[in-house]
Curated annotation (Swiss-Prot):
The keyword Cytoplasm applies. It comes from Pseudomonas fragi. SUPFAM superfamilies: Nucleic acid-binding proteins (SSF50249). The keyword Ribosomal protein does not apply. This is Cold shock protein CapA. The gene is capA.
Length: 64
């Protein structure tokens, strides 16, 4: 199991339900889908928001 990391939301599109996170330690941006957001109610992220995540390999590369 991967370790939890921190990062910043680069952008998130509410209508499409996905966006990208820039890891705090550097590296490639990670795809994030609204289904992966651990939150009650409407699942969205704001540009510039600090988040914690676990990176894992998805169908098209690494994702949060």
């Amino acid at each position: 199991m991967s370790q939890r990391q921190s990062g910043t939301v680069k952008w998130f599109n509410d209508e499409k339900g996905f966006g990208f996170i820039t890891p705090q330690g550097g590296g490639d941006d990670l795809f994030v889908h609204f289904k992966a957001i651990e939150s009650d109610g409407f699942k969205s992220l704001k540009e510039g928001q600090t988040v914690s995540f676990v990176a894992e390999k998805g169908q098209k590369g690494m994702q949060a």
